[in-house]
From Swiss-Prot:
Domain of life: Bacteria
Annotated protein name in UniProt: ATP-dependent zinc metalloprotease FtsH
Pfam families noted in UniProt: AAA, AAA_lid_3, FtsH_ext, Peptidase_M41
SUPFAM superfamilies recorded: FtsH protease domain-like, P-loop containing nucleoside triphosphate hydrolases
Cofactor(s) essential for the protein: Zn(2+)
Enzyme class: hydrolase
Function: Acts as a processive, ATP-dependent zinc metallopeptidase for both cytoplasmic and membrane proteins. Plays a role in the quality control of integral membrane proteins.
Membrane topology per record: Multi-pass membrane protein
Topological domain spans for side Extracellular: 29-109
Positions bound to Zn(2+): 427, 431, 504
Residues the record marks as active site: 428
Localization per record: Cell membrane
Source organism of this protein record: Clostridium perfringens (strain ATCC 13124 / DSM 756 / JCM 1290 / NCIMB 6125 / NCTC 8237 / Type A)
Length: 717
């Protein structure tokens, strides 16, 4: 009836509790409904005509008071004198005279039914209702509200993850760090023989969407071992102590399935630092302590590897990160340009692409995008192709998908007045022209005044020619000038300002503040850090590390940076007013201008800039080709190393098989020799027996001859 003995135990316990509650309820109910009175009180009530009816039932008399009695609404009972052998023939007469209804019942006929109705049926009902409730709670709470020690980990069999390193792109360094773990799980013997121990745990750290969970599954897929997957929040649910019990159960199962991988996603849910704060969570700390104990207790040579993922490594407890636990930290950061292109290739493997599609251009247009973003872009492009009735995805679909992710869908039904449209056009061209005429800015890719659903009335898209990991002070100032170029154009052309620059002002202010408070680009504060960035992988807000007075001075410095950048933008646009008007006219006519067309207009006035830009492009392309060649060389080296490891493993396996075969043959030969010797011994023994038997027969024959000759002699005499 019950597959889970623990569940049966809990239902029995709760049934006993329910029985006690039911017993108490029945006792209280009897106390409330029934009241015992003396027989003399009953007689007095009868004389006062305060009795409505009487029922003689076994050893007691049940009395129902009349409406005039003070005890109205209760059922009274008193002892029946007949039980003691005392008869009162006058009682029946008095009841008849008083007009009181009376009746005689046999209680034994109703005892069984009363017992069933009062006790058995309610208990059965409670039992089955409780069973159904616990069953539903089990299903809803992933293993059960009553399964205290059971973990909720999803167990993937050896080939069920379906993911290998081929499905992970743009994270070559992370994959390289994990190849060692895969090799260890493939063949733990060679590590044990040399005395090497693999790290017990590896912590995957990086922003959301970079592929930390995918990497963990790829490790399991490559190693072809069982894969336990569990979220940190799954350890703690509603009962104190459940988290620690689940940790114990998880590691117990892992040791039984070894070699295997245990993956804990979002481990910061249980691994937060125990800082002694008053608002500490005892249940979470118990779970963390149990996890630390288990990681100390198991032997990594058995082949159990713990992988965990988080995007908040700064909040993790130091004991969790010390050597012997999660002592290897693998950074899974945002992919670079080549990485983004490789990711796009992976996600577009099953998508029909046109021959003219350039994934490199899409990779260039998505700086800072993670794997999840790029997968979404490819899917959006495929959906757009289907929407337009095409059988394959073209470049336009991918370009539009990028813009949908960045700015939202086109909002063609939003009609702007001619004046507003003109303001938006000058605003966007102001951004683009300042970007084109400054030296430390990214090239303009597109200018549009088509409104978008995310609120933009138009936008200017800039795409970097190369990946930048360092930004100079001059570059940051020029970037701020570009941000303020739209407002500057409004001032130069219309001599007024609008609300359209709100987002530009916000971003410019944040960049200027970072220059002063974080990057040490202020002459007044030199290299003093006034703010610190928290949660770097989650785009956390800066935390101020200075006094109110210093913060006020820093605000003045920020204002000066913004003012200088603003003045630079205004100066550029005033000097190039004719170019500003010309490009704006083209934009108003076409609504969208691509970067090449825009730059051709600019090159018409500044031909020397064309040569400089082309030279810079060639240098960047050369560097990119070198980087790509190095990456391919590195990938080939890793591939060869893995193939060599597999070859050696195969050779070792064949040698082991050959050795086992030789040993088996030697054992068989030994057994054969033993059998031959045994057969020879048996044959020799048989020959000896035959010789003995022959000698015995010969002796018997001689005796017969002697007896015969003796008899002949006797007869002759």
């Amino acid at each position: 009836m019950f597959k889970d003995k623990k569940m049966l135990k809990y239902i029995v316990i709760y049934s006993i509790i329910a029985f006690g509650i039911l017993l108490t309820f029945n006792m209280v109910k009897d106390e409330m409904l029934y009241e015992k009175v003396d027989y003399s009180t009953f007689m007095q009530m009868l004389d006062k005509k305060e009795v409505k009816s009487v029922n003689f039932s076994g050893n007691q008399i049940e009395i129902t008071p009349s409406d005039s009695s003070n005890l109205k609404g209760k059922i009274l009972y008193t002892t029946n004198p007949a039980v003691a052998g005392i008869t009162q023939p006058e009682l029946i007469k008095d009841l008849t005279v008083a007009g009181v209804e009376f009746n005689v019942t046999k209680p034994e006929n109703y005892q069984l039914l009363g017992l069933l109705m009062s006790w058995v049926f309610p208990l059965i009902l409670i039992f089955f209702v409780g069973r159904m409730m616990f069953s539903k709670m089990n299903n809803k709470m992933g293993g059960g509200v009553m399964s205290f020690g059971k973990n909720n980990a999803k167990l993937y069999a050896e080939n069920e993850t379906g993911i290998t390193f081929k499905d992970v792109a743009g994270q070559d360094e992370a994959k390289e760090s994990l190849v060692e773990i895969v090799d260890f799980l493939h063949d733990t013997r060679k590590y044990v023989e040399i005395g090497a121990k693999l790290p017990k745990g590896a912590l995957l750290v990086g922003p959301p969407g970079t592929g930390k969970t995918l990497l963990a599954k790829a490790v399991a897929g490559e190693a072809k071992v069982p894969f336990f997957s569990m979220s940190g929040s799954d350890f703690v649910e509603m009962f104190v102590g459940m988290g620690a019990a689940r940790v114990r159960d998880l590691f117990k199962q892992a040791e039984e399935k070894a070699p295997c991988i245990v993956f804990i996603d979002e481990i910061d849910a249980i691994g937060k630092s125990r800082d002694g704060a008053i608002q500490g969570n005892d249940e979470r700390e118990q779970t963390l302590n149990q996890l630390l104990t288990e990681m100390d207790g198991f032997d990594s040579s058995k082949g159990v590897v713990i992988l965990a993922a988080t995007n908040r490594p700064e909040v993790l407890d130091k004991a969790l990160l010390r050597p012997g636990r999660f002592d290897r930290r693998i950074i899974v950061d945002r992919p670079d340009l080549i990485g983004r292109e490789e990711i796009l290739k992976v996600h577009s493997r099953d998508v029909k692409l046109s021959d003219d599609v350039s994934l490199e251009e899409i990779a260039k247009s998505t700086p800072g995008a993670v794997g999840a973003d790029l997968a979404n872009i490819v899917n959006e492009a495929a959906l757009r192709a289907v929407k337009h009735g095409r059988k394959f995805v073209i470049q336009e679909d991918l370009d539009e998908a990028v813009e949908v992710i960045i700015a939202g869908q086109e909002k063609r039904d939003r009609i702007l007045s001619p004046k507003e449209k003109k303001i938006v056009a000058y605003h966007e061209v102001g951004h683009a022209l300042v970007a084109a005429l400054l030296n430390n800015t990214d090239p303009v890719h597109k200018i549009t005044i088509v409104p978008r659903t995310m609120g933009a009335l138009g936008y200017t898209m800039q795409l970097p020619e190369e990946e930048k990991y360092l930004v100079s002070k001059e570059e940051m100032i020029d970037q701020i000038s570009v941000m303020l170029g739209g407002r500057a154009a409004e001032e130069v052309v219309f001599n007024s300002i609008t609300t359209g620059a709100s987002n530009d002002i916000e971003r410019a202010t944040q960049s200027a503040r970072n220059m002063i408070t974080i990057y040490g680009m202020s002459e007044r504060f030199d290299m003093m850090a006034l703010e610190a960035m928290s949660n770097r992988y989650l785009d956390g807000r800066p935390v101020r590390n200075c006094s109110e007075t210093t913060a006020a001075i820093a605000d003045e410095e920020v204002l000066q940076v913004i003012k200088k950048a603003h003045e630079k933008s205004i100066k550029i646009l005033i000097e190039n007013r004719e170019l500003l008007d010309e490009i704006t006219g083209v934009l108003l006519d076409k609504e969208t201008i691509m970067g090449d067309e825009f730059m051709e207009i600019v090159y018409g006035k500044y031909p020397e800039k064309r040569e400089a830009d082309e030279k810079a492009k060639k240098e960047i392309q050369s560097l990119r080709e070198q980087a790509l060649a190095k990456r391919k060389e590195k990938e080939e080296a890793i591939k060869k190393a893995r193939e060599e490891a597999l070859r050696l493993e195969e050779e070792q396996r064949k040698q082991d098989e050959l050795k086992a075969m030789i040993e088996a043959q030697e054992e068989a030969a030994k057994l054969a020799r033993a059998n031959n010797e045994a057969n020879n011994d048996a044959l020799d023994s048989s020959k000896e027996n035959e010789e003995v038997k022959s000698n015995v027969n010969d002796g018997a024959t001689e005796e017969k001859k002697d007896d015969s000759s003796t008899n002949n002699k006797v007869d002759g005499e």
